[in-house]
Amino acid sequence: MYAVLKSFGLKGLNGFPVEVEADISGGMPALSIVGLPDSAVRESGDRVHAALKNLGFKWPDRRITINLAPADVRKTGPVYDLPLLLAVLTASGQLEDVPADAAFLGELALDGTLRPVSGVLPMALAAAENGTHALYV
């Protein structure tokens, strides 16, 4: 099962588009986040896992691979928590109808509430320049 969502990152003072891909497959249960994540992004997996369960959803008991593309640009900060959670829910069939022309940014608390993130203005400008019709922060 596969899902892809839009997000944005920050490189210096400029925003850039990031595709958050989630693939759920057979095999030993594990979570792998690839695409040059920093330590805060790698920790997103733990926050997403806890938030998903505390919101009443089921964590898929399978192998989950998350790719943050483009893979050659470093991804920093907790801004990818929300799109990771939505990608896992969509790929596992627990969420439908995520708007294809929308992008998502946000840090999650362990209970699933959203926390503020830094650098939203340059990411919002990049979203507008890239044809994103809605930005959920």
Specify the residue positions occupied by each region the protein language model found.
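Peripheral, non-AAA+ core regions of ATP-driven protein-machinery
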Residues: 1-137
